[in-house]
């Protein structure tokens, strides 16, 4: 939910960029000053924003770990030294990925923006992602958000979280396998969404999400084909505890080449 003003002098630079968005009910502006430093305005919670950005990750150790397993990924990591995995809000990440099923990026953005505008706290120009209670309180107007077949799933998820039937905060304490299984028990969550949420919200760095792009990479680069379960398991076995980072390097490289 962060956007860059590409018309600004800062964003036209190859070195740095200024991004504005919402984090924890605050409007945040971030600008990369140098390859190793970021200027953040809009919050005093330096520890929190650092954790959100994955700035505390030991990249040297992580990259060494996955590079020892595959020289190709080692090269990709060299070309993208600052890539990190976000620690997104549990509820927001899960709810957003539920909306993302069978939709392109533009459509996903429209749905998330609509939900935030209709139900989220107005922060002055931007809106926070709504809480489960805010969604339930306005559930009678959910049709205005134009979520399509995702509408009832979205409201049901909010109800389960708000009632305590689904304790999403406990998912970080589970093993990857337990988390993956529990997530797939949610209506509308398949294996790809479960892996994405496990990785980006619940810090299971051994998750290895498979979408069409990664599926193509795994086939062309490693000769791995078959079911989602088979390809994902291969990636997790090959790259180990930081398979999620390896997946991001592979995805980024293919995206750039595409």
Residue ranges of model-derived segments:
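Single conserved hydrophobic/aromatic residue that forms the stacking wall/gate
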Residues: 2-11
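Short helix-coil boundary/hinge micro-motifs
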Residues: 22-29, 34-48
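Alpha-helical ds-nucleic-acid-binding substructure associated with the helix-hairpin-helix region
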Residues: 46, 50-185, 238
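A residue-level signal for beta-strand positions that form part of recognition/binding surfaces
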Residues: 9, 18, 37
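C-terminal accessory module of base-excision DNA glycosylases/AP lyases that mediates lesion recognition
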Residues: 1, 15-27, 125-258
């Amino acid at each position: 939910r962060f956007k860059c003003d590409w018309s600004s002098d800062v964003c036209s630079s190859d070195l740095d960029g200024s991004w504005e968005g919402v984090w924890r009910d605050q409007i945040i502006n971030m600008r990369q000053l140098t390859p190793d430093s970021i200027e953040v305005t809009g919050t005093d919670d330096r520890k929190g924003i650092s954790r959100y950005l994955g700035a505390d990750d030991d990249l040297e150790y992580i990259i060494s770990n996955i590079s020892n397993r595959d020289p190709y990924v080692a090269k990709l990591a060299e070309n993208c030294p600052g890539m990190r995995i976000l620690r997104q809000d549990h509820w927001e990440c899960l709810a957003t990925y539920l909306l993302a099923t069978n939709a392109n990026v533009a459509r996903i953005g429209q749905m998330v923006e609509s939900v935030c505008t209709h139900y989220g706290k107005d922060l002055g120009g931007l809106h926070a992602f709504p809480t489960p209670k805010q969604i339930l309180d306005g559930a009678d107007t959910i049709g205005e958000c134009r979520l399509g077949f995702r509408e009832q799933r979205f409201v049901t998820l909010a109800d389960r979280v708000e009632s305590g039937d689904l304790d999403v905060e406990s998912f970080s304490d589970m093993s990857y396998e337990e988390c993956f299984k529990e997530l797939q028990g949610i209506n509308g969550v398949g294996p790809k969404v479960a892996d994405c949420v496990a990785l980006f919200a619940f810090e299971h760095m051994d998750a290895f999400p498979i979408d069409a792009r990664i599926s193509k990479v795994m086939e062309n680069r490693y000769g791995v084909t078959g079911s989602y379960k088979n390809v994902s398991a291969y990636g997790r076995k090959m790259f180990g505890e930081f398979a999620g980072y390896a997946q991001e390097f592979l995805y980024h490289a293919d995206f750039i080449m595409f």
